[in-house]
A protein has these predicted regions:
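Lipid interaction determinants
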Residues: 20-116, 122-251, 256, 260-265, ...
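Flanking scaffold residues of small Cys/His-coordinated metal-binding clusters
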Residues: 12
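Bacterial N-terminal signal peptides that target proteins for export
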Residues: 1-9
Length: 330
């Protein structure tokens, strides 16, 4: 995507807490149905997103219906010869949340859609961004996605701003047809015992730039940031990131990074540009004892995407993404 991305290498208070869920939830992605005649598979994108009274990702969801989360599976097809978009199939379910599950209560209310799709240009803040636009049978736009990368899509509002998730779910869908979910290496575990020291006070002469939350799959970068060793049965990591800036100048100041049993503090800096995107801004969180910072890509003012050590976007699974969503400033 040729948009202006900003790389966040963490400035903050990043609360990362391991959480548990039934091991049966880590299921392989189903094989997509055969492609329509003359078409080939473009990609399968899956995820679980938020849903609220203020945000209805699909118009089929009644305003008076209790909707707290949604499951998504979007299958995109393209012309076998030209690679141009052809048709899609969308499967979703919505409803209230249910404790210790990643599905709407009772399986939720299903939504199934088919139709045509195309690629158009521009979000509200980036005129060069690629947008995947799916149409209903009446030729009205059913839903639009920002193409974050070949493997990541993000649900858009009708004004083409990115939908903002919450501490539990983002609005990012992950490509699943070109990767195999990592199997759990043991029973689901809550992780290290929560023996974290008292939380220190906010740094003096600083203000909060933003607070971001989300739940991510377990990954070596997150383990390193937490300063803990990988442990068997890790299914997801809950993350909370607070960015601090100098109160007078607005320049990056200090960060505090809290894990289940650890707290990190330090400084962060800004670098301009990255490979393939000279307009990107790189924020670096220095980790004591680590040669490399922890990296996040800023898609807009409200979303951060975790990057690997090669500064490539990490791709989640059908349950969790590597996206942090802005919550209220604190």
């Amino acid at each position: 995507m040729k948009s202006r991305f900003h790389l966040f290498l963490g400035a903050a208070m990043l609360l990362v807490v391991t959480a548990c869920a039934p091991a049966s939830l880590q299921t392989p992605t189903t094989i997509p149905p055969p492609s329509p005649a003359g078409s080939s598979l473009r990609g399968v994108f899956e995820g679980i997103t938020a849903c609220s009274a203020q945000t209805r990702p699909l118009s089929q969801i009644p305003e008076d219906t209790d909707c707290e989360l949604m499951t998504w599976k979007v299958i995109l097809y393209q012309d076998s010869g030209t690679g141009m978009p052809t048709t899609y199939a969308l499967e979703s379910a919505y409803g209230a949340s249910e404790a210790n599950t990643t599905s709407p209560a009772g399986g939720g209310t299903p939504i199934a859609m088919e139709g045509n799709w195309e690629i158009v240009k521009g979000t509200k803040t980036d005129p060069e961004a690629d947008v995947y636009q799916l149409y209903a049978t009446d030729s009205q736009v059913a839903v639009s996605f920002l193409k974050v990368s070949e493997d990541l899509l993000h649900v858009l509002n009708s004004d083409r701003t990115l939908m903002i998730g919450n501490a539990a779910w983002s609005y990012t869908l992950n490509r699943t047809d070109n990767r195999t979910p990592a199997p759990l290496d043991g029973p689901v575990s809550p992780g290290p015992e929560a023996t974290r020291p008292p939380i220190p006070a906010a740094p003096p002469d600083s203000s909060v730039l933003g607070v971001f939350e989300g739940r991510m799959p377990c990954h070596e970068v997150a383990y390193e940031a937490l300063d803990i060793a990988p442990f068997p049965g890790c299914l997801k990591l809950k993350s909370r990131l607070t960015l601090y800036v100098d109160q007078a100048t607005g320049a990056p100041s200090s960060y505090m990074y809290m894990g289940t049993s650890t707290i990190r503090v330090g400084t962060w800096t800004i670098l301009d540009g990255m490979e393939g995107d000279p307009d990107a801004v790189v924020y670096q969180l220095e980790l004591e004892g680590s040669k490399e910072p922890v990296s996040f890509l800023k898609a807009d003012e409200n979303h951060l995407f975790l990057l690997d050590r090669d500064l490539k976007l990490l791709v989640g699974n059908a349950l969790f993404s590597y996206t942090l969503s802005r919550i209220e400033k604190q």
